[in-house]
Amino acid sequence: MERWSINDSAKIYNLNNWGGDLFSINKKGNICVHPSPNSKYSIELASLVDDLIKRKIKPPILLRFMNILEGRIASINRVFRNAIQTNNYPAQYQTFYPIKVNQQRQVVEAIANFGKKYNIGLEVGSKPELVAAISISTNNSLPIICNGYKDTEFIETVLYATKIGYNITIVIEKLFELEKVIELSRKTGITPKLGIRVKLSSKGTGKWATSGGEDAKFGLRISEIITAIDLLKQYNLIDSVKLLHSHIGSQVTKIDKIKNALIEGARIYVEMKKLGVNLEYIDIGGGLGVDYDGSKSSYFSSVNYSVEEYANDVIYQIKNICDEAGVDCPNIISESGRATVAHYSVMVTNILNTNTQNQMPDFESILTQAEPLSPTVRKLVDIYKSIDRHSLREDYHDTLQLIQEAVSLFNLGYLNLNDRAMAEWLYTRIIKKINNLVEKMKPVPEELQNFKLSMRQTYFANFSLFQSIPDSWAIDQLFPIMPIQRLGEKPDVIASIADITCDSDGEITSFVGENGRTKYLPLHKIRKNEEYYIGFFLIGAYQEILGDLHNLFGDTNAVHITFNKKTNYRIDTVISGDAIQQSLKYVQYDGNEILKKVRDSLENGVASKKISIEESSHFLELLDKTIQAYTYLGE
């Protein structure tokens, strides 16, 4: 038997490259989570999940590791502080969390609390987000930046909140917004705090590149900025403008694109200062990416730079332009939401079943039987018996032709169902035999390099792709996925992961592998009476809030966990996932009304003797219990 170690498992899932030293495999072959990079303290995920199940918290379970969240906030601020010291930068850095990345109250409150020492702020882009941010701001102390489209109600809310002491900046995205702000400021007599968003010609890279450039949805063109400055001077509001904002898109994969945007933004800052705008801040927006696949490349699921390089370039480029122009350096703001929250959240769920070939009928006897077989089946038997590495390529091509021939003959009525089943069984046996031979070949012939895909099985996991990791479906985003146990054993199956929705799109067929993106996930055969769990990692950004109710699968159970030196971990908060009753309510069904209608039908059934009173009572109890149950599958 081939020896296998936990290091081999770490390698095939590329764990050490995407894990950021926050995830490791222990000697038992189980995934562990660390509160900070290289910490000696850890939580074993498999044991944690077992403990949660004992507490009646069922999978799928979203695990939020609050120490990791705190550590990410500290890490981003630390690297900027170091960059400021290294470059002798004369101003400050400030983090703002864009709450659109994850608006869950417990998450935003935790970020605000962890970030107090760094004077962290919140960025909002809608009226609901504004109200949420105001509610989080204890003693009006939390700075808030308002981006996005704004109507009269939005602007008035900000103005009156400003009057009572809230620190809120309105960022002007369009000229009509500025006109509205001027009008409402004069009407209320309240002077606003203002910023201006510029539409840079520089673009980002990857899926969100269109957030930048001259065709971007938001921001003022250079000519519009000149108009805005004139308007602000005309109405004596020019001194209210303290911030220049730009954004070239989320998950910018190439550092050179970031540098270009920084240079352009800094030049605009310098020129606006020369025009009499007393700017104090540059808000460089988001874009700091996450290395989801661990490749450290410019592929859209990765980045070709570190957080340290990013911070150093931000500080250096802005300082260089300002020093050259003889202009005071601004305080710097970034809105790095993805990089802040991606790592702290892991979803774990159980595998329900597989479509493994082992469930096929056993036709072993046909390999030795002398009785007549159909010519197609007989040829497949001959290939299976004779195949070796010398005839591999020819036998592979012949096998593909024969299985297609079997389907055609069946459709024409020349093969019966049993013959077709025999052909399928032989095909899978031949493919397995070829796979064993291919694994020993060096080099592998070109047409056999993707051969493994024909061996791929489907593992059905207890989750909804559309609810828990919608970006995997919507934009083909890669997320690290791997088993959380048995990592001291060599995987003996390659698989795709299918969810439990009634949708053929609910399947993951792209994974993070040893050499980048791969079309299969190495897994282990399922053992009888033993749960097999997989983890979905780096899903803290956007996934919860973008998830939808496809097939009415609702929010999963969520658990907030902190590390504890005495007991290893502490469960701080448990947020129950949606019950069926809640999911039905979202689409205007009432659980009590449903029960009433069914009760009426049952009474009619009892009266007409279609069902007994005992059966009627049992069914009503069952339906009531079902309506109150978790939307995901149990036993």
Curated annotation (Swiss-Prot):
Biological processes per GO annotation: arginine catabolic process; putrescine biosynthetic process from arginine; spermidine biosynthetic process
UniProt-recorded Gene Ontology molecular function terms: arginine decarboxylase activity; metal ion binding
EC number(s) stated in the UniProt entry for this protein: 4.1.1.19
Domain of life: Bacteria
Catalytic reactions of this protein: L-arginine + H(+) = agmatine + CO2
Modified residue annotations for N6-(pyridoxal phosphate)lysine: 100
Pfam families in alphabetical order: Arg_decarb_HB, Arg_decarbox_C, Orn_Arg_deC_N
UniProt keyword list: Decarboxylase, Lyase, Magnesium, Metal-binding, Polyamine biosynthesis, Pyridoxal phosphate, Spermidine biosynthesis
Binding annotation for substrate: 282-292
Function: Catalyzes the biosynthesis of agmatine from arginine.
Family listed: Belongs to the Orn/Lys/Arg decarboxylase class-II family. SpeA subfamily.
Name of this chain's protein: Biosynthetic arginine decarboxylase
